[in-house]
Amino acid sequence: MGVTSTAPHLLRAARGEIVDRPPVWMMRQAGRYMKAYRDLREKYPSFRDRSEIPEVAIEVSLQPWKAFQPDGVILFSDIVTPLPGLGIEMDIAEGKGPIIHAPIRTQAQIEQLRPLEPEAALPFIKTILQALRQEVGNQSTVLGFVGAPWTLAAYAVEGKGSKTYSIIKNMAFSDPTILHQLLSKLADAIAIYARYQIDSGAQVVQMFDSWAGQLSPQDYDTFALPYQQRVFQQIKQTHPDTPLILLVSGSAGVLERMGQSGADIVTVDWTVDMADARARLGKQMKVQGNLDPGVLYASKQFIRDRIIDTVRKAGNWGHILNLGHGVLPDTPEENVAFFFETAKQLNVLV
């Protein structure tokens, strides 16, 4: 038995091996649509507690594994989790997302940021990832994840999520030198954090550039792409064999650029037909996605038809089945179960 045959299904596909069906997991698969999660949330109402107390985060991460046996089990965390380690204090408000206590608006604030030391700032991440690897063994692939420089900068500068991103765009277009300094520091910290996750047990890492789709293609080329490349290059220097995934929300306008990031796998959202995505990204690029999360409100037949359509368009190599973004909080849990059941039968359905 070679190493290949004992590696978990998703990891094999992510490396480019031919597998009998596309592996499947779901973004935000640990979350509010699950009764088990809602029950736990009553006991631990703070998101930071749920994601930073190891035994709680381990339990949450494993809830979908125990319920549905996805091919990927992802660390339960948030993209802003490493920011306090740089000196950017924050909290995560229930239903509202990250709140930055002192938004980064000046050169002096950027100069005060410190390099990330994950062993000191984020020791719980190692504990969680080691436990997940031990729990799932070779039955599933453990995924880590990080935020991308532009998206973390957007939170740090805006102070919270935004519909217009007017503050960071003002900085980008009026005082780009300051923003580039911030993006550089964030890129180096994110690379350190991703390496720490891999060393702690993550077998695949996904980078979320959630807000880069808010940029025009020319501004993406200036403020997002070079820093995605910087992160991925640094990870690959030390961990060349770890597959890296890139997600950009609303990425239809920058899909080809995502393929230039250094990622091994590009997450496609539902605004791009999967067949078109394959054509635009080229035969060598692996893809992930791309069902509209809203499909999971529908009948079982509709869900099955959409899964089969997506998988046929993606072809029989280099595809990880997923939604185009996170599962929605009011999704019927039994429909998530059906999604996974159907995915596991794709070797006979397609």
From Swiss-Prot:
It is found in: Cytoplasm. The record marks D78 as: Transition state stabilizer. CDD domains: URO-D. It is an enzyme of class 4 (lyase). Its main location: cytoplasm. The keyword Coiled coil does not apply. Substrate binds at R28, Q29, A30, G31, R32, F47, D78, Y155, S210, H325. InterPro entries: UROD/MetE-like_sf, Uroporphyrinogen_deCO2ase_HemE, Uroporphyrinogen_deCOase. GO terms for cellular component: cytoplasm. PANTHER family: METHYLTETRAHYDROFOLATE:HOMOCYSTEINE METHYLTRANSFERASE RELATED, UROPORPHYRINOGEN DECARBOXYLASE. Catalyzes the decarboxylation of four acetate groups of uroporphyrinogen-III to yield coproporphyrinogen-III. This is Uroporphyrinogen decarboxylase.
